């Protein structure tokens, strides 16, 4: 039931929030512009098994014609209107894009790179809203090199392509926009709400590019030091549960390239699961 003076869009989000809160699991919910953000704490359940902490953005979608066809509608609380969304083509185009990228260490590189850049965001921006994870995925889709043969080159090529298009973040006079991951969506999406936020994101990408290039050069003579540099970009042990793994510290093994591959962990940002 819509409240007095409440828009249809605000009503849909409010009812979605109430439905989530009735699920029975303790959750902290917050209404965003187009979604409901849900923070689920870890839950100890000796019968059904423990449930891990989880953060979700739940977007209610209205299906005007057919659930298999785009576009659909989502509520925009700030604009007070319905906006098109393309969930089917977003998924299908992402799968195609991923499978058309080179495999590196057994993984298609596109989706793995998305996970790495989202980990990068967590290290440098924490829980800040900017840059949004979806925006970073759009940026990877637009600027990645699907032919990259090695992870370090996949990261360098992505960052280099971004920096080539935006060589002077401090001189920006407008907020850059990127294409949606859906090839059907004709609209572009701003990478931030303000020019200052956009400059901050792009400056961090410029800095990261410099560091990753330095790490690649350093790896030719000192693999351990190269990994330490990459930890500045992708996190170190104990840093927000993310890490770039170090090779063995033994001087006789510091230049052993294979040692990095052997030191895998569930928090290794390079170990994205298979996709598609």
Segments from the language model and where they lie:
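Hydrophobic, mid-to-C-terminal alpha-helical segments
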Residues: 124-176
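Hydrophobic, Leu/Ile/Phe/Ala-enriched alpha-helical segments that form helix-helix packing faces
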Residues: 16-27, 121-124, 162, 166
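A long, hydrophobic alpha-helical segment
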Residues: 92-147
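Generic solvent-exposed, charged/amphipathic alpha-helical segments
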Residues: 13-21, 114, 118, 141, ...
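Terminal (often C-terminal) interaction modules
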Residues: 171-276
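Extended, alpha-helix-rich binding/interface surfaces that flank or overlap catalytic cores
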Residues: 47-115, 264, 272-276
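Conserved catalytic core of two-metal-ion nucleotidyltransferases
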Residues: 4, 9-69
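A generic structural motif
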Residues: 2-6, 146-147
């Amino acid at each position: 039931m819509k409240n007095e003076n409440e828009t249809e869009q605000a009503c849909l989000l409010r009812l979605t929030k109430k439905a989530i809160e009735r699920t029975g699991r303790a959750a902290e919910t917050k209404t965003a512009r187009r979604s409901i953000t849900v923070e689920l704490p870890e839950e100890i359940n000796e019968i059904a098994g423990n449930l891990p902490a989880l953060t979700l953005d739940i977007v209610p979608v209205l299906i005007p014609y057919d659930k298999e066809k785009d576009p659909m509608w989502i509520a925009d609380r700030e604009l007070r209107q319905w906006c098109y969304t393309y969930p089917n083509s977003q998924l299908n185009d992402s799968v195609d894009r991923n499978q058309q990228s080179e495999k590196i260490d057994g993984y298609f590189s596109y989706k793995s790179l998305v996970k790495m850049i989202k980990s990068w965001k967590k290290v440098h921006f924490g829980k800040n809203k900017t840059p949004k994870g979806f925006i970073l995925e759009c940026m990877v889709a637009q600027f990645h090199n699907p032919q990259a043969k090695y992870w370090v080159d996949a990261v360098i090529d992505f960052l280099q392509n971004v920096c080539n298009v935006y060589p002077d973040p401090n001189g920006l006079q407008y907020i850059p926009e990127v294409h949606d991951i859906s090839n059907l969506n004709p609209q572009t999406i701003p990478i931030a709400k303000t020019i200052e936020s956009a400059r901050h994101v792009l400056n961090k990408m410029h800095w990261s590019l410099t560091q990753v290039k330095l790490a690649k050069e350093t790896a030719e003579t000192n693999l351990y030091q190269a990994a330490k540099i990459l930890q500045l970009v992708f996190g170190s042990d104990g840093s927000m549960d993310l890490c770039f793994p170090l090779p063995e510290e033994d001087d006789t093994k510091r230049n052993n390239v294979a040692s990095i591959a052997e030191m895998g962990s569930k928090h290794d940002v390079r170990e994205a699961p298979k996709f598609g």
